[in-house]
A protein has these predicted regions:
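N-terminal Sec/SRP start-transfer signal
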Residues: 1-32, 196-201, 210, 245-294, ...
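Short cytosolic juxtamembrane segments of multi-pass membrane proteins
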Residues: 3-5, 180-194, 571-572, 662-666
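Hydrophobic alpha-helical transmembrane segments of multi-pass inner-membrane transport and secretion
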Residues: 18-48, 54-91, 111-125, 205, ...
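Hydrophobic transmembrane helix bundles of membrane-integrated enzymes that assemble
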Residues: 200-221, 228-253, 285-318, 322-328, ...
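Short helix-loop junctions at transmembrane helix boundaries
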Residues: 40-54, 123-155, 212-230, 605-666
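Basic-flanked hydrophobic alpha-helices used for secretion and membrane insertion
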Residues: 315-556
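Hydrophobic alpha-helical segments
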Residues: 113-257
């Protein structure tokens, strides 16, 4: 046979198998569209000379890798469903006289058609949708970009290469299946059921243990930086644990139900449990995949939408004042470190600021001037010791200030006796101990109810656990030395200023302060809220854009796996339920059995995904704090709304795919 005949035969095969091929082709086109648009955005077209473009391009570049990796895994997994459904077809071809090399050519042309259709339609849709999505991104980030022609040659090349390699892998996997199987095996392969699996007790126990450790990491308290490391560890443990529990734990549970004779020997339960048990090994991977993808959708959408909804709160949390100057001495590795700050340098800078405000006839609405010593230390209950760990995330940020400084900042009048101190700790209304040990010195903790805690705790960072210790005048340096073994090199200084003036005037004053610092050789840095607002919007707007993109991709993956699983199950169950009719079961009883099995299998991944999301809430809340989002209640509401919305979408998918299942079975 010549190649033209193979090409025509491949086209006919694809047309006749459209029930299975069309969903696969649509998923290919969808992933091509998403990857092409994200890669085009990552190329930076239209972002030239735009403030905040580096942030957007970094996020878009990260999204390109995420979507590309998922596309490869998802399309290979989807192809495995197609391969199973077509075993009988390929076996029939061989029995009718086609050799394996002929089937290889047929598969080649089918893969070529699918690849060409996916790329052609996908890139065309990507070009058309790019302009719309570019405008959406600009709206979310609050920036102004120039919409250029969306056809990026580099993005087209990357898309063709990625999906070309994916289709080559799928072609080789399908080819391997044909070459290692005999025609009779292929002819009956699509109809072969699973033998009743043995109870894998060790795997089930391992799954519970991994899930338990993952949940423990998510639920235990830690700093925000430590939470980021533990988040990825917890994800890995929960993913593996989920696969183990769905494959082994579900079988163990079904066998427990089977041993319960009063429950098992009911018509509805007998048929559904038996059917699920015999095929659970095959279903387990699909169910676990649906569960993990559903969890990904819930987490990604809830986090990204919450960050966007509270973006103004994030801005004011990160930049509580219009203008701020900071200079931190002696905390290398985790904060900006500057040369020692002296009293004289501080006064020179403040004098320069006052002179400029007087020249511009601007008045202060608020002014704060904090001077303290800062260090990282290990805190164990009421003991503060020099940090021994190389991991900064495991340490606590300690600020030591004198009572006169505290009184000046808060407006209170605290008088400490010799050996006394005030202690304020993050997230705690009152310090829980009567004494505090700073190295080799012990201080009595004075009870002091205050509503000024936020003035002395560096809550805007939200990264490290924070503790502030207030000592008597002239004792702060001694307290620092008791922990660190040496005196501090100089002050750490925070200066905050709010003006009676508009955004433009605030930016002008901020620029002038930067000039004053440069002329005074003062190695601090200035932050102006209105200047930094663009950066915040660029980051969180692009994160929302990416979150919705990735969430939609995960949702598409879950829907496709659900569809293929339902269709595959329908063909497997059709003969079984025909047998049930022949042995006397009514259509009503059969339909109840079908419904019981489908509902159980279908909604189990959703239930587990919701549990995963709820357990992950404390850990994700800490990560949100690191992103300067302190409102846990808003995050809780956003998560609840996301779960409810996803459940509705999941229910719609159930109704649609259940119809296909019932149509095949009945």
């Amino acid at each position: 046979m010549n190649n033209l005949l193979y090409a025509r035969l491949a086209k006919t095969n694809l047309s006749k198998n459209r029930q299975n091929i069309l969903p696969y082709l649509l998923s290919c086109i969808g992933t091509v569209v998403m990857f092409f648009i994200m890669d085009t955005l990552a190329q930076g077209s239209g972002f030239d000379s735009m403030i905040g473009k580096d942030t957007i391009l970094t996020v878009m570049g990260m999204g390109t890798y995420i979507i590309g990796l998922f596309a490869v895994i998802f399309l290979i997994y989807s192809n495995s469903f197609l391969a199973k459904r077509r075993k009988k077809e390929f076996g029939l071809f061989q029995i009718l006289g086609m050799e394996k090399k002929h089937l290889a050519k047929l598969l080649f042309f089918e893969s070529l058609y699918l690849w060409a259709a996916s790329l052609g339609i996908g890139i065309l849709l990507g070009v058309l949708l790019y302009r719309l999505l570019f405008l959406v991104l600009m709206k979310l980030t609050g920036l102004n970009g120039t919409i250029g022609f969306a056809f990026s040659a580099k993005a087209v090349g990357s898309t063709m290469l990625l999906f070309g390699l994916t289709f080559v892998i799928n072609f080789l996997l399908s080819l391997r299946q044909i070459h290692v199987s005999q025609p009779v095996e292929l002819l009956h392969g699509g109809a072969q059921g699973e033998r009743e699996p043995k109870t894998k007790l060790l795997t089930a126990v391992l799954g519970f243990m991994l899930l338990g450790v993952g949940y423990y990491l998510a639920l235990t308290r830690q700093s925000s930086m430590d939470a980021l490391d533990k988040f990825f560890n917890a994800i890995a443990l929960v993913m593996v644990g989920t696969y183990c529990l769905f494959s082994a734990g579900s079988i163990a549970f079904l066998k427990i139900l089977k041993k319960n004779k009063n429950y098992y020997y009911q018509t509805r339960h007998f048929t559904s449990i038996s059917g699920m048990l015999y095929r659970m090994k095959q279903n387990a991977v699909g169910l676990a995949n649906i569960c993990i993808l559903s969890t990904g959708v819930l987490l990604v959408i809830s986090i990204s939408t919450c960050l966007w909804t509270g973006i103004e709160e994030v801005t004011y949390t990160r930049f509580p004042h219009q203008i701020s100057i900071e200079a931190n001495t002696g905390v290398s590795g985790i904060m900006k470190t500057v040369e020692p700050v002296s009293q004289k340098m501080i006064e020179e800078v403040k004098t320069g600021i006052d002179q400029h405000l007087e020249e511009k006839q601007l008045r202060k609405k608020y002014e704060s001037d904090q001077r303290y010593y800062v260090m990282l230390a290990d805190v164990d209950r009421n003991k503060v010791e020099k940090t021994q760990s190389d991991d900064a995330a495991a340490s606590t940020l300690i600020k030591i200030m004198e009572e006169s400084e505290y009184n000046q900042v808060t407006g209170e009048q605290v008088e400490l006796e010799p050996g006394q101190a005030l202690v304020f700790q993050e997230k705690q209304k009152n310090y829980g101990y009567d004494t505090i040990e700073l190295g080799n010195q012990t201080y009595e903790v004075k009870k002091w109810n205050t509503d000024k805690k936020s003035y002395v705790l560096d809550e805007k960072t939200q990264v490290y656990e924070t503790m502030t210790v207030v000592t008597r005048n002239h004792e702060a340096k001694e307290a620092y030395a008791a922990v660190q073994g040496k005196e501090p090199e100089g002050y750490s200084w925070e200066y905050a200023l709010d003006l009676i003036g508009d955004a433009g005037e605030q930016i002008t004053v901020g620029n002038e302060i930067e000039t004053i610092l440069t002329e005074s050789s003062f190695n601090g840095w200035v932050e102006v809220r209105e200047k930094e607002r663009n950066t915040v919007y660029s980051l969180y707007g692009s994160l929302l854009f990416l979150g919705v993109f990735v969430g939609a991709l995960f949702l598409m993956g879950a829907v496709m796996i659900i569809y293929y699983k339902q269709v595959s199950e329908g063909f497997d169950d059709r003969k079984r339920f025909q047998i049930m009719q022949k042995v006397g079961m009514s259509r009503k009883e059969i339909r109840q059995t079908i419904q019981s099995q489908v509902v159980t299998v279908f909604f189990l991944p959703l239930a587990v995904a919701v549990v995963h999301t709820m357990v992950a809430f404390p850990l994700t809340r800490r990560i949100m704090a690191m992103l300067n989002f302190p409102d846990s209640n808003l995050f809780l509401v956003a998560t609840a709304i996301t779960i409810a919305a996803f459940a509705v979408v999941y229910l719609i998918v159930y109704v649609l795919t259940a119809r296909a299942y019932y149509k095949i079975v009945e």
